[in-house]
Each structure stands twice: as C-alpha cells, then as structure tokens.
Amino acid sequence: MDSYDAVRDLHAWRTDWNIGVKVLRRWFIVHRNGNPGLAFVFVDEHGSRIYGTCGATCYEYFERVCLEGGWVRLTNFGLIRSDWERKERVTKHKSQITLNSETKASRIRPLSEDPFMNFVDFDDIYNRPYNLLYPVDLIGVLVNVGELLTSDSSSGSTEKTLKFTIKNLEDRTVNCLAHGDFAVDIKNQTVGVDGPVAICVLTDWMINKYQDEITIHDHENIGFSRFFVTPPIDEVLIYRRKIWEKIKKRMEDARNHGM
C-alpha cells in the first residue's frame, strides 16, 4: 500500500509532498483577475482538511481529474499561507494548496469510507463564539420550511431566500437561511418532508450572529454548503434510532401516567 504524507504536516518549506486525499468539496470560483478557477477542500484518511485552488491555465485538467467524492494522489503542488478572508477560510489549516501546471494528480482507491462530517452540538452554536469563524456541520429534524422569498442581494441584484428550522434530540432549534439557487433546491428537496424522523444534514454552513440572534447561513462561496434529506450514512441511522427510542419512552411514560 502506498504511503502518503499527512495533510496536517503540510507546510511551504518542503516541495516534495505526496498526499492521498479525497476531494471533499469542489466549486467554481472567479479569481481577483477575473479568470475562472476551481476551489477544493481536500481531506486525508485521518480527517485533516486543506483548501486548494487552481487557475484558468489548468482548469480543464483538474476539472477532469479531481472529481468531487473521488480520491486522488497529489504531488508537485504549491503551498501558501491561508487567506484569512472569510470567503477563503473554509478549513483550519494554516496553509492552502495551489494546483498548477507542474502538479500531478492521479486517481486512487478510497483510503477511507468515512463521510468526514463533524456534527456540532446545538449548544456549542450558542455558547462558543469561536464557531463563528469556520463552517460547521449539523444534523437535526426539519420542523419548519418557509416560503421562497425574493430579496435584494449585497451585489444590488435580487435573489431567492429560504428560511427553515431544524431541531435536535433535546428539541432545541436553530433557524437557517439559504440563498439563490441553493434556496430553491432546498425548497424542492423538502416538499412533503415532515414528521418526527424528517432528518436533514447540513454541511459547511456558517454561524451568523446579529445582536443576540443566531442563525445558520449557507456559505458565501456558492456551491460550498450542502443540504441533504436523510442521506444514507451511519450517523442518520443512529439519529433515527434515538428518535424512535425517545418516542417510545414518551409513549410508555404517558401510558404509565394514565394507569
């Protein structure tokens, strides 16, 4: 089995790195010079993540080779210090990868079946302000989906917005807000989805605090945040079992109380 360097060890003072990573996220970007590019979040088998980008000159190559969900071996890539602007702050790694014409990428077999979702407790959202800095993953039950609304965006144009609410096993709720085509997609996904086990998973969303109000927003990088209804992962199966256990206990308590 091939040996790879750990993503957590990456720094710019070496140039011979050899990593095996999953393309956890991939989305389209426009660089400051106006040229198109791709952005990525790579994760290794240990769960360490790093942000990466490529420019227009090698766009087609990495679009073809680095497919979201696939695993790749990367060598001859560049490393620079992470950009701490909020838009680029998608991992906690101190460096970020630059893919260029010298970079070699080849597909490899998966090194892990882990979905690499790190679910945040709802209490942490309200009690730990540092969570505001980085994207978070959430799992909960969908309890309310509003109507699609049209509002003014920061660019001066109009966009669709959608508000919805999820709750955890302790019935604590968080309000969520999605924008643009993503809002429309979530609205379509949630048609007819209700009931005690309407479990949804949100990955890479941002915590937004305005005065004393906390909301969860999709990331300003279009295509980065994701929304899933009952995805086929172990965490959802465990969550569903806990819900049914809670319902069963509530019914037993009610029956015993009525005796």
Locate the predicted segments by residue:
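Single-stranded nucleic acid-binding proteins centered on OB/S1-type folds
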Residues: 1-259
